[in-house]
């Protein structure tokens, strides 16, 4: 199967008004000052994960179930540790083999790692952290588990990025049908769990594609399936293993392992992510029609550069749909970049946006008669800052087909 991606960038400022929400003067949504450390309790004096300070045996509930949260008379919370790149936590395959990427997923992760900053991180838009990402974000925003035996479920509470939670159902239910998961994917997915001795096993599916697996930008598709194993090995330590299975992005499942420390004096405080998110103050606004050719093109207002990643599929009418990745760059003045439908990158030679009906026309390829070319004609949909996509038709030589790509925050 062929894989297609755009290796550099293209972007339109008018679309940015709704669909990119990016800024030049970026302040990370998770930024806090030292007073936040003091306010949260013990000022960061927390046992090192997996360290010698066990703090005693792991507590249990009245029915003997391992207690992942506070004791009845105590307080405290788990503190995420900063594990930037999950490849450093690999246990299967070995670290020497690396994460088993598919080519398009590796290209996207490398782009996010080398060419981007926090301005593309979904968490910078107050988007929830999915899978095991909340445990490895670092910082001073704790996590709590609220066990509700009478309801046969566990609530996982996360202070960052903005009072998120997820339900872990322990009542023996199955996941929703594949059709329902495809129709209503979510940021956190659908989680069911069970106990294997002292280990909580959590099975999660039904993710949308709007999150990163880790802070380094490991991508995933809606096929992502995560198995987490959580074991409180002592009062002060939580051991976590997470297995990621995603045949749309990786060639095989891969597993990481790490530990979190218990902060005995910590608790979740009010943290309103949106109040510290500056993106919406710096939307790029259109002052002229977005028409340009190569580097000479499209003059737009305010001159704010922006980046964005679109993922989706394209393929011939009635044929197999292949993965399409579009990495977009808007330098504040022009739509630039390349279109790469094969091994050779095609520079953008023409870009036209009609802001009245939100259509975008892109042409790429070498100049001259008979040169290989690709043409994309699309229309933007879902014009909100949380969900937006570009759907349309393409022409490549004698081949014609359709495509749909969605902005990945």
Outline where the language-model segments fall:
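Bacterial N-terminal signal peptides
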Residues: 11-24
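N-terminal secretory signal peptides that target proteins for export/translocation
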Residues: 1-8
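PEST-like low-complexity, intrinsically disordered acidic/proline/serine-rich tracts
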Residues: 26-325, 332-346, 355-359, 363-370, ...
